Amino acid sequence: MFEGIGGETLWRKEKQRPVKELIDFHMDWLHKKNEHDEWLSDRDGELYIRVFFPFFWKNFIHDKIFLSAGSLAFQSLLSLVPLLSVTLSILRVFPVFESLNRYLEDYVLQNFIPGTGTMLREYLNAFIDKTSSVPLLGVVFLFIIALSLISTIDHTLNEIWEVYAPRKIVQGFTLYWTVLTLGPVLIGSSLVASSFVWYTVFTEGPLLELKTRLLSFLPFLNSVIAFFLLYMLVPNRRVRFYHAVYGSLLAAVLFELSKKWFVFYVSHFATFEYIYGALSVIPMLFFWIYLEWVVVLTGAEFVFCLGSLKPKKSISEPFDPMRGIDEILVVLGWIWEGQKTGTPLSMKSIMKKKRALQPSRARSIVDLLLQAGIVHGTANAGFAVSSDLYETTLFDLYTKIPGGFGANESETRGNGGAILPESIGHNVTAGIKSAMTIPLATVLQDKIY
């Protein structure tokens, strides 16, 4: 239903709009929806889905998921042996887990590194055995490598949630240390419990075949739980329970599909073995870890978008360039200062600035400045001013802003919204121009903003 904005006629007409305009229209409608509407109708649900996926894809590209997955895959490959060494070392402290080491290896290799054969097991066992003779300083170094991987995961996920304020050192170290030390114990405990249930319930009694099939879903269930805890606990921001559930289900399904595809690829298209020979296990392992991180970050982006795109009325109004001119000047001033110091600001650096400016609004302002040609991107993913701010006036800025004086030169409106006659409109524009001849450099240097 579209009460208050045109009814059925508007529903038919809006389908004929260009894609970008259509998405903007849908987003605006979703934010203007009555806040008392707790549920979406069928048509509203269809509209929400049509808006959600472009919104998800835009954030997916903006957050550079594929690039982040590659970075995490490389660091994971370097941290794999230290992480497994630390995990097994902690498990060896508890005698009850001593018999589970072999089972843990089988579980990890079968469910998380499929299709790589026994070669990987032999290499990992050889590397891990060598770490047992490492001196104390080397053990500390292994812990540092493992902690750095956990820290990188934490920072990457929080960037997706647009949380750029770093955790306090004590808080971050406590969190990472808890994950590293208690994580293996919890994994071992779950394996003990699973083994107990297997031997006492699933290996005897009626319906043995059905029980065996149900047990085959255990890896999928473990994946759902792991993804849920990751999306629920790691972001330094409140995440709704059901959003984390939906994201963990999506990630678990993609994870199972990627496992099947990877096994099929390795068994039917042995490209790595032909090219790399005995060293093929390294690129195969890297490729698989890369796929895993793409799945993990895709699920995280999905959870973030579920929490960001709301069908109910938005608390914050959409950004109005004309009313937000002071915020535009603030961002322009940051970019100009960075350019003068020789360190162009990136989007991440702009969002980290200590000012009451929402990350989404800062992104909208940068996009607006780019579209207006006021700033441009640099080779190192930063931004720089495109024109001489000593020659560009405040009026010039207003004419380039969407909805500003240059939006429609043939129409000038009064305070009541009525279109003024052309002659009066030109006089009004000329008067405003003469009053706004101050250069932008002067505005920014005097810190009028």
Swiss-Prot record:
Its main location: membrane. It is a multi-pass membrane protein. Signal peptide: none annotated. This is UPF0761 membrane protein Cpha266_1653. The chain crosses the membrane at residues 77-97, 133-153, 173-193, 214-234, 244-264, 277-297. Keywords: Cell inner membrane, Cell membrane, Membrane, Transmembrane, Transmembrane helix. It comes from Chlorobium phaeobacteroides (strain DSM 266 / SMG 266 / 2430). It is found in: Cell inner membrane. Belongs to the UPF0761 family. One of its GO terms (cellular component) is plasma membrane.
